[in-house]
Swiss-Prot record:
Official protein name in the record: Conjugal transfer protein TraC
Keyword Transcription: no
Superkingdom classification of source: Bacteria
Region (Disordered): 60-98
UniProt keyword Iron present: no
Amino acid sequence: MKKPSSKIREEIARLQDQLKQAETREAERIGRIALKAGLGDIEIDEAELQAAFEDVAKRFRGGKGSATGKRQAGDSRTGSEPYATQPTGADAGGLSEA
């Protein structure tokens, strides 16, 4: 039996709300981590910061190359990609302020 279009619209609206809530939680989590790392005190262009975050994401996904600060068509995170285990602290070799 097929669902009526009104039920499908209700389900889509419910799922969009769930997606918005999940994205908000993720953004707040990343924001808290960025503030703890001191990024709130650094004067940096938004495009540069975007590129740095993309580099970090590639590092944890196991990719290589530098980011441009712009999203490519088809770039999306589904949550199904595995994360690579990376060292933390001084051995991480991540972003640092000179």
